[in-house]
Structures are given as structure tokens and as C-alpha cells.
Amino acid sequence: MELVVKSVSPETLKTATLVVAIGEGRKLGVAAKQLDELSGGAISAVLKRGDLAGKVGQSLLLQSLPNLKAERVLLVGVGKEAELGDRPFRKIISGILTTLKGLGGSDATLALDEIVVKGRDSYGKTRLLAETLVDGGYIFDEFKSQKAEPRALKKITLLTIKAAQAEVERAVTHAQAIANGMSFTRDLGNLPPNICHPTFLGEQAKALGKEFKGLKVEVLDEKKIKELGMGSFYAVGQGSDQPPRLIVMQYNGGKKSEKPYALVGKGITFDTGGISLKPGLGMDEMKYDMGGAASVFGTLRAVLELKLPINLVCILACAENMPSGGATRPGDIVTTLSGQTVEILNTDAEGRLVLCDALTYAERFKPQAVIDIATLTGACIVALGSHTSGLLGNSDELIEQLLSAGKAADDRAWQLPLFDEYQEQLDSPFADIANIGGPKAGTITAACFLSRFAKNFNWAHLDIAGTAWTSGGKDKGATGRPVPLLTQYLLDRAKA
């Protein structure tokens, strides 16, 4: 879908549908007032009849109003001005998009510039609006024999004042890149595990390298992984016929002297739990256990499209966790790339086993900050549900930057503690560390495990187990999170 920004009067635009705001108490917005005057009071007459009160969620379609070039005018309730937050604003925009799709017109124009969203300037409000529109058009029907009919709606014009046009256009550019990144992430996550395996993800990385010149891509096979001494990473994939892959993608958009930022993604393309087998119910959703790697792919795509002036290295630890005669057993001890030994008490705590070696590998790039992203623990879903990602780390400054980015992008995270006392739960009588810490504080002890491999750089861990996908029902599927948060963090660093 194409988004266009214009600073013209709404009554002069020839469009299939013109959308204007009506506040609670039948209060006409600026654009609605202009249209009402031109149409001889047609809008106020409809409102006086009580057809629309202006509450959030209400809408009314008017056909062929006199003296207007628009074929239709859609009145949309926006509630009380002082009470409109991010969530109701998104609901309003989603409702508009649903209505526009149903009308069948090829274009529409939104004259909603006067809407005030709490805590957001023109840029922030437009970002939210544009991301909602573009992401709302997402369809995944690759494996349907009956494809969805092509959408008639091809273009949406956003009206704004001349003074704000540059900021609104910047917001739209950022939003489109982020939405494209989210779409890429969702596509990868929604693919079935018989297609999306570690080798396939390596091929996706190489394809991205061909699409964007200047992106350096290296895919390390299982032989190289073993030679490097990544005993923990290798152990996770050794029970599968699908070999593991370590994917390294480097983008150098900044100065040569600038240290890179590093994103490390967990890429378990299917997680049975291994010998510590998961229950059968809902196991199909374990194809989403590569959501961390998928979100790194999506964030990188957004960065590449925006050509951000930063240096970025992306490291994806990809494997399939399967039971077999050659699979890792509970009680096995492995040696990590860092030299630390790990007693594997539960083979279903495999995400941290691939990430620890990837974090150690990231150290060679001398990064100024490392963020790992993983669908790591069910405990995070218990703690935070499906609305908020868990956030832990060893740098207060980095944590604050990510929290701020999440708030700005409406893709929130919440910090959990990483106190030394939790480290004791990982003690092992046979190795340097155990891979699980008992039933208490599962998200925290998982991050404590990772922290042992992140002592030499600023590090943060995003647990996206509750936010990477939606379970069950018609809305089941990958969400594309936390691409908005990560991209906003990098936009802030690039000051773009």
C-alpha cells in the first residue's frame, strides 16, 4: 500500500473516500467543519439526528455530499480529545482501514491531522498511524490453494499542514520501513518448519545480501561451528537431520572508526524440547521459536531500507531441537566457546545454549552494545502476558534506552531484576553452570545464565516469548515484534 503526504485543503481533493474526525459530543474537527460549510450543513444535519455521537469506534459513511470532489465522506468518532492514547488511536485507525477495505475504492484520504494523541507530537502520531495502516494490510496465504483476492485499496493520502509536512513525511518513511521489516519477520515466523529450517534461514540471509549491496553475509555450517568450539550451540542441533547454521550479517553504514551495535537472535526453527520432550498440545507453535532470529532479520531490513548511518552486526544461532539416538541427553556436559562448561539438565532449555556461544562470538566485533532477542521462557508469559516483552541486562544506560525506544514505538518492554542472588540457582556440582535454575524466577535465571557470557560488553536481553506470536483462533500468527522497538533504538542511535 502506498502512503502519500499532501498539504492541501480536503475539499479540493478528488478521492474515493475522505475520512474526517468527529469528537465526542458531536464535535466537528477542523476538516469536518470545512466540509460541512461547503456541503451546506449536510454533516451537522446528520449529527443532529443522532446518527453519530463521536465516541471511539463509531463511524458513519455519507455518500455524494454536495460541492465536494470526494465520492464518499467517512465520519469517524475519536472520543474526548484529552483522553486519546496509543491503544484507542490504533483502534480508530484499524477500524478505518477495515471500513475502507470493505468499500472497494482504490484510494482514500485521511484528514485527521488535528487529532491529539497523548504524549505524541506530529511525528510520533503519524508513525503510529502509518505503521498501523501498512501492517494492517498484511496477508499470509502462501500455502492456501485459494489465494486472497487482490485488495482494491492501493493508496492512502495523509493530509497535513504545510509546516508539519517534512516531519510527517519522515514519519511515513520510517513507518513504511518498519512495517516492511515486520512483514518480513512475520513471513519467516509463519512459514512451516519443514520449509523454514536453519539452512533455509541461511539462504534468506544470502538473498538479503544480494538485494542490498554492502551487506556482508557469512553462513557457518555445522563443521565450522564445531571447529570454533561452540560445543553448547552444536549440542542443541545434534539430534536433528537439519544441520545448525550460524548466520553473520554485517552492515557498515557508519564511520569505520565507530564500533558496531550487535543484535543476536535465537533461531530454533522447531523446538520439540529434545529428549526433555514437550507436551503434544500446541507443539505446532514451536515453529515460532525462531522469533528472535526473525525479528533480527526484520530489523536489519528496516535499517537497510532507511540506510541508517550506523554499523550493525547481526548474529543468528539457528538449529532444530529434535529427539533421536544422537540427541543431547539430560546430564550431558558441554564446553562453550567461552571455555565455560555447562551441565544440560533439561534439553528444553536450549535457547540459552545456542545464545551463549553466539554472545561469545559477538565479542570479536568489539561492539558498543549487544542485544539478544529470544522466545526464551514460558515464565515470561506468566509474568508479563502477551503485551510486554521482558528486558534484563548489565547496563542501566542500555536498559533505559531500550525502554524509551519501546515506549516511543508503542512496542513496550518491562525490566526485570538481575540480582546476584539469582545466580546461585544455576550452581552445578559437576560443571561451571547448569542450564536451568529450578522452578522459581525462570525468566531471570535464564538471563542470569546468559549474563555469564556477556561480561565484556554492554548487554541487554529481550525475552519475547509472549509477544512474538499470537496463539490460536483466526488471528493466530507471528506479530512482527519487537521490530518497532529495535528499529526505534537504532534510529535513536543514528539520530535519524
UniProtKB/Swiss-Prot annotation:
Which GO CC annotations does the UniProt entry carry? Answer: cytoplasm
Question: Any one Gene Ontology biological process term?
Answer: proteolysis
Q: How is the cofactor bound?
A: Binds 2 manganese ions per subunit.
What are the required cofactors? Mn(2+)
Q: Which GO terms describe its molecular function?
A: manganese ion binding; metalloaminopeptidase activity
In terms of SUPFAM superfamilies, this protein maps to: Macro domain-like, Zn-dependent exopeptidases
Task: Report the subcellular localization.
Answer: Cytoplasm
Instruction: Quote the catalytic activity from the record.
Output: Release of an N-terminal amino acid, Xaa-|-Yaa-, in which Xaa is preferably Leu, but may be other amino acids including Pro although not Arg or Lys, and Yaa may be Pro. Amino acid amides and methyl esters are also readily hydrolyzed, but rates on arylamides are exceedingly low; Release of an N-terminal amino acid, preferentially leucine, but not glutamic or aspartic acids
The residues listed in the UniProt record as binding Mn(2+) 2, with positions renumbered to this chain, are: 266, 271, 289, 350
Q: What span is annotated as the signal peptide, if there is one?
A: none
The residues that the entry says bind Mn(2+) 1 are 271, 348, 350
Pfam families xrefs: Peptidase_M17, Peptidase_M17_N
Query: What's this protein's family per the entry?
Result: Belongs to the peptidase M17 family.
Q: Which NCBIfam families match?
A: PRK00913.1-2, PRK00913.1-4, PRK00913.2-4
The job of this chain, per UniProt, is described as:
Presumably involved in the processing and regular turnover of intracellular proteins. Catalyzes the removal of unsubstituted N-terminal amino acids from various peptides.
Q: This protein is called what? A: Probable cytosol aminopeptidase
